[in-house]
Amino acid sequence: LANGARGFRYDTAKHIGLPSDPIDSAVVKAGGSNDFWDIATGRKAIRDISLLLPADSLFIYGEVLQDRNIPEKEYAEYMDLTASNYGHVLRNVLNSHNYYADSLDNWHHSVSPERLVTWVESHDTYCNDNESAGMTDDQIRQGWVFLAARQNGTPLFFSRPMGSSRENFWGNNRLGDRGNDEFKHPEVIAVNKFRRAMSGKPETIYANTDGSVIEVTRGASGAALINISEHEQEISMPTTMPDGNYTDGVHNATFNVTDGIIRGRLSGMSSYILMN
């Protein structure tokens, strides 16, 4: 913190005990307790040393992968939590090319969405049994646009290995190399800027009839249109955007809004960011 760090990720956080967990009798006799998280987040000092800055001024989240009997709400008293189940649901939708294939309108977590860390895939889903490694970069990117355009959740972008492909998941596989170029794809840059511009604006999510196109609107201020199919789609669907013509800055495509209906064409596996 003295050198400028303003946040922490606690790996495998769910394997570190909470105050409600059982305590070894020897620890009890010595006056100890399950106080790791109280110390780590500055609630309790140890040998008169405590966190340099208040925890609520930092971004702290724990890798608490979801499973049965995980006390998520107790962990959330100390930190934000990973929404691993939501990532699974999103990948299911992307692989099905259909918004209605699963329930993206539900965060699948017991903690409020503003306390969640989201992802399309993580290092675990990419590396462990290659659960998500077979998905194309285009699919992952459209999933990212969806997450980043949303009002809640703090999305994380997993940077796949440089030189990787769907035939060679590991790519160059050199220690210290940065990931591939997807993190600076124009669609990723556009939605990242959109996210900052839309901070605090309420969201509404729509999908067209066959679920191939998802729209995330942020009040009357902006909208993200995402084609999760591999084919061009012509849309006519509800929106909260005011009447007018809007041009996407990445593809230079124009969409028209009249009487609460947005119309236009989207290329396969592509996204369009519109701002008022």
Indicate residue ranges for each PLM-predicted region.
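Active-site-proximal helices and loops of the catalytic beta/alpha 8
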Residues: 2-276
